[in-house]
Curated annotation (Swiss-Prot):
InterPro entries: ATP_synth_csu_bac/chlpt (IPR005953), ATP_synth_F0_csu (IPR000454), ATP_synth_F0_csu_DDCD_BS (IPR020537), ATP_synth_F0_csu_sf (IPR038662), ATPase_proteolipid_c-like_dom (IPR002379), F/V-ATP_Csub_sf (IPR035921). This is ATP synthase subunit c. It is a multi-pass membrane protein. It comes from the Bacteria. Keywords: ATP synthesis, Cell inner membrane, Cell membrane, CF(0), Hydrogen ion transport, Ion transport, Lipid-binding, Membrane, Transmembrane, Transmembrane helix, Transport. The chain crosses the membrane at residues 11-31, 53-73.
Length: 80
């Protein structure tokens, strides 16, 4: 029974990291598309849009990095 619990912890950690990567890629893809759309509509605002784009992209990318850290913690500290 203990092996089953360990296997479930590994599966949970892998799903956590995988879903975080999928969510980040979808979020950054949508964000990049909206940035290009805004730059095409208002070329004069590209510097402002670029600054806001990188700030929001960093925030969108921070959550999956936290999930990857938690997933690795579960894999190596809790399950290992």
């Amino acid at each position: 029974m203990e092996n089953l619990n360990m296997d479930l912890l590994y599966i949970a950690a892998a799903m956590m990291m995988g879903l975080a990567a999928i969510g980040a890629s979808i979020g950054i893809g949508i964000l990049g598309g909206k940035f290009l759309e805004g730059a095409a509509r208002q070329p004069d605002l590209i510097p402002v849009l670029r600054t806001q784009f990188f700030i929001v992209m960093g925030l969108v990318d921070a959550i999956p990095m936290i999930a990857v850290g938690l997933g690795l913690y579960v894999m190596f500290a809790v399950a290992g």
